[in-house]
């Protein structure tokens, strides 16, 4: 074949355009938003030589292979859990239905795949030292099974400390399962995992590149942070395993984040979420533990697991429902503020209802493009009457929602499109006045250390910066 022939060049162009048409049809059927589908389809149809590769990397919005794996995992879990004593767990689910505060969140029972459960114990863990001290202490006490899942695991001081602890527990005969995201933990050396594997720890990466079309995908990421010890103690929140979460990065220090320690029936839901992800990675199920009884008092909790395999956009709908349910206040903290149109409309409507709407975001960037897009959305929110604040001491990474006087949510989900539609996330919804008071105290302290964004801040921004913000917003759906 003459590669210098003009016919060869024409064949290549024709092939690229054919692939562009196929990809455009794929976008029409799979991209969840009309705007996204139109943008991808038009660009793939007319300029596929510029957009075909980006679409392979960033374009897919559904994760059908995971849906099939979840279905198979659920079938195997039903068999594996048939001999477990579910009666106490069911009783806690029935008790939770009597809560008037939870009833105000009218869509939540059907929105989440997991029910609200009564009689849980929750403890607020503010910042990295408290979080990792509690996690390490719980793992030290493990006797049967330890489940560990993080988006990022670094081979640094805290990462090596976790590794050594898990090695000791494996030597004691404890079954240890570790799951990390392949993209988030791309810098983790193979030797880290291999040393754990050699000691009997089962460790795997969560990767989304199964099948030919998905092999280029880095868009779907497992952003969940879950630790469950012996089915009786669990943790969920915003921390990953890295020294920066303990203030080890001078540019971002002090790092501000929040986790929750959990006990009670809701841990069965955390185990279910872990089991589904583990099954995707290994086609096996980890052991699941249910206690024979639960305490007679505690708080209402619902684990809200969300991701691109859901039939609807669970994470986005949660934020919308939480904002719509607010009658007095809704306070939100998130490192990234890139709301979709529905969430932004919910925020504006809450302001018009007289709700105290406050959102706390970082004053320092960890990703400059995301920071630029967040800044533009923040200016628009201020013009709509939302009170926007920038946290001054260091980088703010916590993901917290406080609604009125009883409802709070803490987890891994950010207020951005990636959490809404692309990432696997998990959030703990808690309905309890005392715990909400603790969250209020924590957030009040954070707001006191923040500077409120004013309308004048937008006018003081240089036009070049404004242009950069608007360009960043154009690509915000894939940030």
UniProtKB/Swiss-Prot annotation:
It is a multi-pass membrane protein. The active site is at 223, 225, 230, 397, 399, 404. GO terms for biological process: cardiolipin biosynthetic process. Residues 218-245, 392-419 form the PLD phosphodiesterase domain. The keyword Cell inner membrane applies. One of its GO terms (molecular function) is cardiolipin synthase activity. It is found in: Cell inner membrane. Its EC number is 2.7.8.-. It is an enzyme of class 2 (transferase). Its main location: membrane. It catalyses: 2 a 1,2-diacyl-sn-glycero-3-phospho-(1'-sn-glycerol) = a cardiolipin + glycerol. GO terms for cellular component: plasma membrane. Keywords: Cell inner membrane, Cell membrane, Lipid biosynthesis, Lipid metabolism, Membrane, Phospholipid biosynthesis, Phospholipid metabolism, Repeat, Transferase, Transmembrane, Transmembrane helix. It comes from the Bacteria. The chain crosses the membrane at residues 8-28, 38-58. InterPro entries: Cardiolipin_synthase, CL_synthase_A, PLD-like_dom, PLipase_D/transphosphatidylase. CDD domains: PLDc_PaCLS_like_1. Belongs to the phospholipase D family. Cardiolipin synthase subfamily. ClsA sub-subfamily. Catalyzes the reversible phosphatidyl group transfer from one phosphatidylglycerol molecule to another to form cardiolipin (CL) (diphosphatidylglycerol) and glycerol. This is Cardiolipin synthase A. It comes from Pseudomonas putida (strain W619). The gene is clsA.
């Amino acid at each position: 074949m003459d590669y210098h022939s003009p016919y060869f060049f024409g064949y290549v162009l024709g092939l690229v355009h054919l692939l562009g048409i196929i990809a455009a049809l794929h976008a029409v059927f799979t991209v969840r938003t009309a705007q996204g589908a139109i943008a991808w389809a038009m660009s793939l149809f007319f300029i596929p030589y510029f957009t075909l590769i980006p679409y392979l990397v960033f374009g897919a919005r559904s994760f059908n292979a995971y849906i099939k794996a979840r279905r198979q995992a659920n079938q195997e879990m039903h068999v594996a859990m048939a001999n477990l004593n579910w009666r106490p767990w069911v009783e806690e689910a029935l008790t939770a239905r009597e809560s008037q505060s939870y009833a105000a969140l009218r869509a939540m029972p059907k929105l989440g795949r997991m029910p609200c459960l009564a009689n849980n114990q929750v403890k607020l863990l503010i910042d990295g030292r408290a979080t990792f001290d509690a996690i390490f202490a719980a793992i030290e006490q493990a006797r049967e099974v330890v489940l560990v899942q993080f988006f990022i695991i670094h081979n640094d001081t805290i990462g090596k400390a976790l590794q050594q602890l898990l090695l000791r527990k494996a030597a004691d005969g404890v079954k240890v399962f570790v799951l990390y995201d392949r993209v988030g933990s791309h810098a983790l050396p193979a030797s880290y995992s291999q040393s754990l594997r050699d000691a009997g720890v089962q460790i795997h990466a969560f990767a989304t590149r199964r099948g030919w079309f998905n092999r280029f995908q880095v868009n779907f990421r497992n952003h969940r942070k879950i630790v469950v010890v012996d089915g009786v103690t669990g943790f969920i929140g915003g921390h990953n395993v890295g020294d920066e979460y303990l203030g080890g990065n001078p540019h971002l220090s002090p790092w501000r984040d929040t986790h929750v320690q959990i006990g009670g029936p809701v841990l069965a839901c955390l185990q279910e979420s872990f089991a589904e992800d583990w099954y995707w990675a290994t086609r096996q199920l980890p052991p699941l533990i249910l206690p024979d009884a639960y305490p007679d008092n505690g708080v209402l909790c619902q684990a809200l697991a969300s991701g691109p395999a859901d039939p609807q956009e669970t994470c986005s709908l949660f934020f919308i429902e939480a904002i719509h349910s607010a009658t007095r206040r809704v306070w939100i903290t998130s490192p990234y503020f890139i709301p979709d149109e529905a969430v932004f409309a919910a925020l504006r409507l809450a302001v018009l209802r007289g709700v105290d709407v406050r959102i706390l975001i970082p004053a320092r960037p960890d990703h400059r493009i995301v920071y630029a897009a967040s800044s533009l959305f923040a200016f628009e929110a201020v013009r709509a009457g939302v009170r926007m604040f920038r946290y001054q001491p260091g980088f703010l990474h916590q993901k917290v929602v406080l609604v009125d006087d009883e409802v709070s949510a803490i987890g891994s989900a950010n207020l951005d499109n990636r959490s809404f539609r692309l990432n696997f996330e998990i959030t703990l919804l808690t309905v309890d006045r005392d715990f909400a008071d603790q969250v209020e105290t924590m957030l009040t302290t954070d707001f006191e250390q923040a500077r409120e964004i004013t309308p004048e801040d937008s006018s003081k921004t240089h036009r070049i910066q404004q242009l950069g913000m608007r360009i960043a917003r154009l690509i915000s759906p894939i940030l």
